Amino acid sequence: MLADKSAKNSDNYSKIKEKFLDFKANLPKHFQKNQGRNFTNFLAKEYDDFIKSYLNETMREFFDEFVPQNDSFAFSVLATSKYAQTLLSANSELEILLVYKNLKGYNIKNFLKEFSEILDSSGMKFVIKIAEVDEIFINFKDDLKFKSETSQLRYICGSKSLYRLVKSEIIKIKEFDKKAFLNYHLKAFLPFSSISYLAQEPNLKSGFGGIDEIYHLNCILNCLDSDVSVRSQALKVMNEKEIASFNLNVDFLLSLLSALNLTQNTDTFSASSVEITTNFMQTKSKKLQDNESVISQKMLSSMNNVAIYSRFIAASLCRPFFKSELSFEQRKFARLKNGFYEINGVIYVPLHKKPALIEDLINELLELKDVDYKFDISAIFYIKRAIITKDGLERAISEFKKIFLRENSYAILKSLLDAQMIQILIKPMEHISQLAEYDGYHEFTVDEHSILSVKFLENIKDKFIKNLYAELCLEGKTMLKIVTLMHDVGKGLGGKDHANIGANIFRAYANKLNLSQKAINIGVILIKYHTLMSNVSNREDIYSQRVIFAFISKLGDKQVLKLLYILSYCVINATNERLYNAYTAKLLRELYEISLSAFSDENLLDEATRRVKKEQSIKRNSEFLALEPKLQEKIFKITSNLVFTKYSASEIINLSKVADSLNETEIFINNTKNLSIQIYTNKSLNLSALLYEFAKFDLAYMEIFELFEKKFYIRLDFNQNVKNHELENTKILALKSLNSEVLREPLKPNINKDEINFELNHSKDYAKLSINAKDQRGLMAYVMSVFDRLHFQVTSARIQTVKNRTRNLFLIEKNERLESKGEEILNLLISE
């Protein structure tokens, strides 16, 4: 009979366990049913029910049909720690206290032992502590961990009378050495004058603004006054709306933590979590914002709020328990005109100071000395509570500009960021607030990165760059500071080209601040190209003339170059300080110096500027947009600037298509009005031989352009044409001549000394040869034969004959041979 009962009990325990395992397997469905809302309360209720089932079954096993009433059996199961505070996620441990009263009438220790073993084998994650009610105070009064875990208890099952006795004992240990307990939990929030930057991939439990901070806050609130609820304690320093906002943030973080537990078995949110959790939580996108950024932005915003609110409540309620080290006279001296207090470089605001109008708040901040202050959490919350009206905000924005006139703007801007007021004063920053960037480079969110950029601007360590900044006028420094803060405002709006979007946004906002038109125009260029200097220095050949002139042509003048150099330093450091190393600094400095010198060559700068404009036109061309991305990139790597000067966007695209598909030399002949030969090649050709053979057709125009991947485009236009039946033979002759290894020796033309100009140092990469002479048959064949004989590579050429005069321009690739044989070129070409 006893064996049958034991088997039956065992079977009942197994059924409870199976039910739990089924419940656990279906947790994702339970979560998605309400999109994770109130999921922590759902978990607590379900776990409570399983514990009750196990207790009821154990009671039946021990007492059979004589089960005593709950209150008659001196045993209770109480939730402690985060389980009691309902701070649960799917992977949470369940901390419980099994409490009993040692009575002679029951063999309760034997019951406790078996019940504990049953719970341990249940498959649930229990952390069990056992205590005898009369021994709680003596055993645990100095145990800060136990005092923390039991600072809030929640009855699950068992004797309620015993539960009330336990609460009385817990109140006693709370009162014992209360300051030590408060200090223990306050450490989690210190210092109150430093709000950390948010990690983009935070641990939702232990990270800044995570669940552990809520736990520490609850422990503090539960200790302050046992007769007052946690909510009532918080209401002493916060209003209903603020508490409701705080609770929503907590609930979202707990839901997100469960989503991470259920989908990836982790407590840490990472770049890889974004898509998975977004889909799992069925997060919907907002206007101009994709689904992926919504969830990370909401998470980081919630963590920021939890961190700010928790610190404010903890500081406000705990400070009265600790005597100030300042004397009355010292406190009096620390008080400022605006009602703030400045103590050891930290700004404090009394709790009783009423919230200010937004325009008055800005003036109060401007009254502070131009010093790199820190702002206590009391000051942050005072800023957060500013009263905002439409007219008041307009007045505040007009005064807000003055913050940028200060040498130490960062401290105030950081306090406005922490109070989430910066996006109200700078509306364009609203969509980048707590916007994460999972690109492998950015350490912080977009808004924090922007504020941090200002910090690096005001604390430049590079002496050379610091001197450049010191040389700026006040308006230049002010404009650059605003640009530095707003350089990324184009992000988060759904477009790929955040720099151009940001430049347009800056223009509109800068007009509100009444910056001069010149300052606004420069600011627009800086934001439009704020990544350019870094990209060029790291990814391109900064010793290439083409690269340098393409770079500076976008900037326009030396002053913009200087400002961009300073801005690049700040942005790179704010992205991740490890990125600005000695190598990066050297590249940026060299790019700056080379570019500064290049501004003196106005002709080449004008050529490069025209190229940039043509490139912009190509980018908008529908034919270009239809090309493969690889070919699009190749077009902008065309070496010759002259291609962009001479040809239309469509013509450049067509040239590039042919060159891209080229396997060997291709020749195209047109004979409509006169003979025209187009040659595409990826190897050296005997062009002088072709010109020798075709001299009778009278060359009128020739151009040679280097395209990309060492491919060349050559065009020859003659004054004469050929008979149509001779076209095929003409093409065969052209190909034969080009591939010939025979060096022809055309008759030397008459070129006077004053008709030729050779610039060996035209640029770092190229020498330039110009000929302006009388047109003579075979002249170009002879010139090209000289180049072939001396093994010089022509990268660009333009030859035109007008009114019996031939005007020739050649760009020749510089090398040691060219530098040593410069005089020989002239001797071979000049007939005198």
Identify the meaning behind each predicted range.
Residues 256, 319-388, 395:
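Structured, charged N-terminal subsegments at the starts of enzyme catalytic cores
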Residues 85-94, 98-110, 470-599:
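Divalent metal-dependent catalytic cores for phosphoryl transfer on phosphate-bearing substrates
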Residues 149-196, 200-202, 541-544, 551-552, ...:
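Long, amphipathic alpha-helical stalk/connector segments used for oligomerization, subunit docking
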Residues 94, 264-277, 290-344, 543-832:
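Non-catalytic interaction/regulatory segments
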Residues 13-27, 31, 41-62, 66, ...:
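Acidic/His-rich, divalent-metal-binding segments that scaffold phosphate/diphosphate chemistry
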Residues 3, 10, 176-320:
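Conserved nucleotidyltransferase catalytic core and NTase-mimicking acidic/glycine-rich helix/loop elements
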Residues 44-52, 58, 67-70, 108-164, ...:
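Conserved catalytic core of two-metal-ion nucleotidyltransferases
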Residues 52-104, 109:
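Active-site nucleotide-donor binding segment shared across nucleotidyl transfer reactions
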